[in-house]
């Protein structure tokens, strides 16, 4: 309850900061480049739409690195077919120890898309493999089944522009059930008819919205 009360002040501060959006848009040339890391394990059902939506984010300079963490389904093959991936030789510094990497791919359709194929080691190990291959100083971790708003990268980078001491930032997680989604983007938010899912939405609001804002 105390966190919920404290979070109200953070929400008010956040709403006031949103008025700066138009001002910040004029400084798109100063946006720090970002590497988006997408660890994927058996994500054949959603990987194509998720990657496509990430490639369409409204941001000046970013790369998308999908890390196939030893998937046993068709995750890698779907990526190869959909985005015309071709294997490439890569020499990079192993800054973080990871499970063996089997290969690197680049897309013939999207120059800012790369895929790492490695042995299974878990989400943290997959992220470490992605960090080893990043080209930019900042990285953003995104689950392979997540749906982002087009301006989400601009918003999560805003704290870095406002305060150079910022080392990490995060967003709010919500449940997409009952909402209208097209081509990997949220068109209209809605509520599901299932009561249990509605209860889960309330729990997500408590944990990820009020909880995080309260602690911040």
Locations of the language-model features?
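Short aromatic/hydrophobic "clamp" motif used to bind/position activated sugar donors
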Residues: 139
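Cell-envelope/extracellular polymer assembly enzymes that use nucleotide-activated donors
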Residues: 32-35, 63
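A conserved acidic beta->alpha catalytic loop
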Residues: 68-88
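N-terminal membrane-anchoring/stem segments of glycan-assembly enzymes
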Residues: 1-30, 212
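The conserved acidic donor/metal-binding loop of glycosyltransferases
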Residues: 143-147
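Short, well-formed alpha-helical segments that are part of the catalytic scaffolds
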Residues: 17-21, 43-56, 77, 125
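Short, acidic, metal-binding catalytic loop of nucleotide-sugar glycosyltransferases
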Residues: 52-61, 82-89
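Long helical/loop segments within the catalytic core of UDP-sugar-dependent glycosyltransferases
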Residues: 6, 88-128, 132, 150-151, ...
């Amino acid at each position: 309850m105390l966190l919920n009360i404290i979070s109200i002040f953070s929400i008010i501060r956040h709403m006031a900061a949103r008025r700066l959006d138009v001002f910040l848009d004029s400084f798109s040339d100063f946006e720090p480049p970002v590497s988006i890391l997408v660890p994927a394990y058996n994500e054949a059902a959603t990987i194509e739409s998720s990657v496509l939506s990430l490639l369409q984010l409204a941001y000046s300079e970013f790369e998308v690195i999908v890390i196939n963490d030893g998937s046993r389904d068709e995750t890698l093959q779907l990526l190869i077919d959909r985005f015309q991936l071709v294997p490439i030789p890569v020499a990079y510094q192993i800054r973080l120890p990871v499970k063996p990497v089997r290969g690197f791919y680049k897309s013939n359709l999207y120059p800012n898309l790369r895929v790492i194929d490695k042995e299974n080691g878990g989400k943290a190990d997959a992220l470490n493999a992605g960090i080893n291959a990043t080209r930019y100083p900042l990285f953003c971790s995104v689950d392979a089944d997540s749906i982002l708003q087009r301006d989400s990268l601009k918003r999560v980078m805003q704290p870095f522009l406002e305060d150079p001491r910022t080392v990490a930032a995060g967003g709010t997680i919500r449940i997409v059930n009952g909402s209208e989604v097209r081509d990997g983007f949220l068109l209209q938010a809605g509520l599901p008819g299932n009561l249990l899912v509605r209860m889960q939405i309330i729990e997500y609001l408590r944990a990820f919205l009020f909880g995080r804002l309260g602690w911040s």
